[in-house]
């Protein structure tokens, strides 16, 4: 990206590594205009029911996403040949592609994947940019949500711990509660190889020592591909630790996303 990043690009960079910037990123995104690979009827303004042919790009895992970009320069960095594109407001793009997975600044060093559920929340009346979902686990209904500002000291200490435990692949944090009125607890989800009991015990010890106050905290194992809590955490929450990167990053062809 050039030295003259626009506001959205600047916030995207910040939000990729610091969750505190994510609410501002989402607010700015919804007010922004973006560049989308594809074609539209010549000379027509793009509205929700416009006839568009938007490109789908395939990720390394075989899943399909609709790419869109923060600027023309960003789009040009992601493609090798001349590329037709459509310029439109983000809200229009989200409304006309409901049910699809979209990827902001795909193939670039920093980007953001948007799952269908997250897009629905973003353009809903509540305008809530944080992932939230009610799930059934063991016959009980639980509400899980993204944490806007995780406890910094606890995250730092757990990251240091996990760097010393090779079986830990990724670690996540979210909030969990039984109903809308209940007080939420923090939940740490750990994806690891082999026996995880000792890892959970060590995590609990460090989390308890570094969490402000006497707030309760839950810890569980998550497995990609499983339903319930595991699905929500691995598909909707960005890891705060990842063995390959050791940070708040996931990868898309070796690039980072929120």
Curated annotation (Swiss-Prot):
Q: Which Pfam families match?
A: SseB, SseB_C
> From what superkingdom does this record's organism come?
Bacteria
Q: Which InterPro entries match?
A: SseB_C, SseB_N
Question: What's this protein's function?
Answer: May be involved in the enhancement of serine-sensitivity.
Q: Which NCBIfam families does the entry mention?
A: PRK11611.1
Q: What is this protein called?
A: Protein SseB
Q: By which gene is this protein encoded? A: sseB
